[in-house]
Amino acid sequence: MNRRRQRSLRRLKNQLKRIGILLALLIAVILMICGCLYIGEHLFKKDKQSDSKKDPDETNISGDVQPNPDQTVTDPVLDLETQILNTYNYQYAKPNASGIHIVLDAGHGGVDGGTQAGEILEKDVNLTITKKVQTLLEEAGATVTMTRETDDYVDLADRTRIGNQASANLFLSLHCNSYEDDSSITGLEVYYHKNSDISKQYAEAVTQALKDTQTIRIREASKQNMQVLRNSSNPAIMIEMGFLSNPEECANLTDPLYQEFISRMIVEKVISIL
């Protein structure tokens, strides 16, 4: 019995030793895990503190720039007026057109394409620029009546009727010129009818105002027997904005920035003489 009891006691002691070893190992593992968690949390806090001290414009890990909310971000694209100033040395001064009524006539339209340069039709250039002039005039406070606003054919009698019914301060017709015999001829030109002294006065005044900008070639005002000028009960002028037969002027007249430029120049100088 004593031997059996001794063996049992030895077995129990051995089992207790194993349990003790296992508990010690378990405690060691738990302590290691806790230590790792503590160290990780401590390092994370240090990283956050370090990040908070960095320049807000410093690049982050993904390569994105962190913006500073206190800084104003400037759009790299220049505004339209600055582009016009830089390209054509022309600074648009928005006029006060309050109380002024102008009839705008975009020459040709529909089946009447006007003059042509390759695939470029005068009627399209006329309408595009005329609508820009319309917008600028209305922004300046003017009342505007259009003889056409789409690619439609409006005969000359109807254009005159629309203008006369409007009782406007000015009937302004916009066209593009052409001279196929000599493609080197260039320049903007203002027409009037010989029977209207006030139209002549306006044409010459606009011509001089445009010349004063010293931006593009301006030809002398001239009298022409155009129906919309001849039959207008309002002062009436026609501006030939350039020659589509000249490659350089054709390129200009179809360039969106140039169209914005010439529209502003026409609006400012026409309003200045009314």
Feature locations, PLM:
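N-terminal Lys/Arg-rich, disordered targeting/topogenic segments
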Residues: 1-20, 27
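Hydrophobic membrane-insertion alpha-helices, especially the h-region
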Residues: 22-38
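Non-catalytic propeptide/linker segments at domain boundaries
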Residues: 30-34, 43-100
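Active-site histidine-acidic residue metal-binding/catalytic motifs
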Residues: 75-160, 166, 186
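Structural recognition of the beta-strand scaffold that forms the well-ordered cores
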Residues: 101-105, 143-147, 170-174, 189-191, ...
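Solvent-exposed loop/turn segments at secondary-structure junctions
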Residues: 109-111, 150-154, 176-181, 196-198, ...
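A short, glycine/acidic-enriched catalytic loop
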Residues: 113-120, 179-205
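Active-site-adjacent mobile loop/cap segments within catalytic or ligand-binding domains
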Residues: 173, 181, 222-274
